[in-house]
Amino acid sequence: MNAPVLVLDGPPGAGKTSLLARMVCALADDTLWFTEPNARLSCGLAAPVHPSPAGHTLWFLRHELDKSRAMRRLACDPDTRLLISDRNHLGVLAYCYATRAEDSLPYRTARDFYARRIAPELPETVLTAILLVSPDQSLTRRGNVAELPRWKQWFDEGLLERLHRFYTDIAPSLCPTPPTVINTDGATPETVLAQVAGVLADAGLDQTARRLTSATARAPRPPLDPQFADTYAQLGGLEAFGHPFTPAIAHRGGTVQLCQLGALHRDPAGHTRLWNPLAAPVRRAA
């Protein structure tokens, strides 16, 4: 059986990336994952064609198309038990629905792109967990103030209210199969993890679910590992990656460290680069 895809999506502050980090540490070689899409880490022909909001939205839509195609290939890898994605097309559509930025791509245009181009390319089994958080809780969890100027829009209360409305009322109808909706207000990370583990158990991944719930939680916000420091800085540092969310962990013969907006990978030969499952399968160590 091909590996299922688990998508984690929802408004900022819902705990998606923290949950992904716990899953990556717990499941190790049995999983491949996609970090949150990040146009800032793309370059050359892969970069956005125009710096406008519409240009960036088109980049995200095309990225989701490429990712859907890659996931179909990666799901066939016998070494992979589970693929995990921090956001998918829902994140792009949510932004188009909620933003009031000038020169933004119309929501209907983005939705039609999903229906015509992305949906037919999705893998056989896509499980979706929508993590909800109220606007007030979203702001509180993230300290109420943007750490960097470019993140300021994600602290706008009106935007957060519209995102919450999208994920509550609209997003479930845009999932390949009915999603599991988890309200994280007042919930502990262990409670949310247990609900996601239940999604996997219901899909037949009992052993994977047990590994998740039995794994010890690691300390949040670990330091950047020195082996990744140079590449982290060269590719944009905090502005591009955000903060580290896992320590350096062994993965299929190499080492990876997951950050908020990307991950870095060091292969067995000592080459360090951006973690990018779109490029080629990451094989288990011989």
Regions found by a protein language model. Give the residues of each.
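P-loop (Walker A) phosphate-binding loop of NTP-binding proteins
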Residues: 11
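Conserved lysine of the Walker
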Residues: 16
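Hydrophobic positions on the alpha1 helix immediately C-terminal to the Walker A/P-loop
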Residues: 19, 23
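Conserved substrate/cofactor phosphate-moiety recognition/catalytic segment
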Residues: 24-71
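Glycine-rich phosphate-binding loop used to anchor ATP phosphates in small-molecule kinases
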Residues: 59-122
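A glycine- and Lys/Arg-enriched "phosphate-lid" helix/loop adjacent to the NTP-binding pocket
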Residues: 95-168
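NTP-dependent small-molecule kinase module
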Residues: 143-149, 154-215
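Extended, compositionally biased repeat/scaffold regions that form elongated interaction surfaces
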Residues: 206-286
